[in-house]
Amino acid sequence: MPKSRRAVSLSVLIGAVIAALAGALIAVTVPARPNRPEADREALWKIVHDRCEFGYRRTGAYAPCTFVDEQSGTALYKADFDPYQFLLIPLARITGIEDPALRESAGRNYLYDAWAARFLVTARLNNSLPESDVVLTINPKNARTQDQLHIHISCSSPTTSAALRNVDTSEYVGWKQLPIDLGGRRFQGLAVDTKAFESRNLFRDIYLKVTADGKKMENASIAVANVAQDQFLLLLAEGTEDQPVAAETLQDHDCSITKS
């Protein structure tokens, strides 16, 4: 998308959610998570496709989503039971990180779209959250409850942020294993600058790395963090069928990092 159109889309998004965020800046009361049977793995798709997208086309309202953008083909949804977490979800039927559509050369840059929506999280925290403490994650097939791609936009855990502060991106021009565990798991890192993040299909980089290692995409889990000025670190964990690795563990949806 040309930068001018991306800027228009982002400005529309900002304007569309200001009213919704205004009330959230007061106090957030979070209901307890109910004890429920195994989740319907199509529930998120039904919400976004049947309610948010169709409702928007009929009435112009986004509910129950926060925003629907047909130009970019995405919706933003406030995660249930978490005070600050948002999800970016494609309007197209894309099952998850393993979906071949993600690595097509003309595929939508959903990761950068998610990063552009980080202000939804920071606004709920009175803009007290530095960008370096925002993390994007995608879980593997065997560590998720939904079979519609959703990118978690949330706060970094304090331990994750502390570990990533010591990263020298010049050491990660190619894939390299981090010297320490993150969330008790081993991750590999690849540094990208803002221009590459915005213009490059990082899902293609992930696919090439995972297949070169003889692993399966459905077991891959990824995260993206802003570790320095104009520098991001793409993180990859290659789990197995029996030992899934959920990148979401690098996040803290209560955003305790802002309260320490």
UniProtKB/Swiss-Prot annotation:
Entry's EC annotation: 3.6.1.26
GO biological process: CDP-diacylglycerol catabolic process; phospholipid biosynthetic process
One Gene Ontology molecular-function label: CDP-diacylglycerol diphosphatase activity
Primary localisation category: membrane
Keywords: Cell membrane, Hydrolase, Lipid biosynthesis, Lipid metabolism, Membrane, Phospholipid biosynthesis, Phospholipid metabolism, Transmembrane, Transmembrane helix
Matches recorded under Pfam families: CDH
Compartment(s) of residence: Cell membrane
Pathway: Phospholipid metabolism; CDP-diacylglycerol degradation; phosphatidate from CDP-diacylglycerol: step 1/1
InterPro entries to which the protein is assigned, alphabetical: CDP-diacylglyc_Pase (IPR003763), HIT-like_sf (IPR036265)
One Gene Ontology CC term in the entry: plasma membrane
Spans traversing the lipid bilayer: 10-30
Topological type in the membrane: Single-pass membrane protein
Family matches, as NCBIfam families: PRK05471.1-1
Protein name: CDP-diacylglycerol pyrophosphatase
Organism of this sequence: Mycobacterium tuberculosis (strain ATCC 25177 / H37Ra)
